[in-house]
């Protein structure tokens, strides 16, 4: 599943931890936005890790699920080109 994750976390320490966790699951797109291509196990693990870390009264994490058709309709204007980090072994 393709998930766009955004977060608003005022505490620097928690925000840094969330950023570090998300870097291991997807690609950092903007300051508090990641794009992740996850299977159901990865998603469950990620959601659990994030839920344990945040303070719900102060922090907000939003997850947007994009179907395969919607992924082809994503437009980008400006910014750095998205890198394909696929590794191939020959």
Language-model features: locations:
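C-terminal structural segments of small proteins and small subunits
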Residues: 53-90
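A broad, structure-centric signal for solvent-exposed, well-ordered loop/edge residues
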Residues: 16, 41, 45, 70-73, ...
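Extended, hydrophobic alpha-helical segments
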Residues: 1-42
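Short, intrinsically disordered low-complexity segments
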Residues: 33-59
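A broad, low-specificity signal for short, low-complexity segments enriched in glycine/proline
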Residues: 22-27, 47-51, 71
């Amino acid at each position: 599943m393709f998930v766009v994750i955004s977060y608003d976390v005022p505490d620097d320490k928690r925000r840094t931890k969330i950023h570090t966790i998300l870097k291991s699951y997807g690609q950092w797109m903007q300051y508090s936005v990641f794009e992740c291509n996850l299977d159901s196990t990865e998603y469950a693990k990620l959601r659990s890790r994030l839920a344990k870390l945040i303070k719900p009264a102060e922090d907000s994490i939003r997850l947007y699920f994009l179907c395969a058709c919607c992924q082809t309709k994503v437009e980008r204007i400006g910014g750095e080109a998205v890198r394909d980090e696929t590794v191939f072994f020959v």
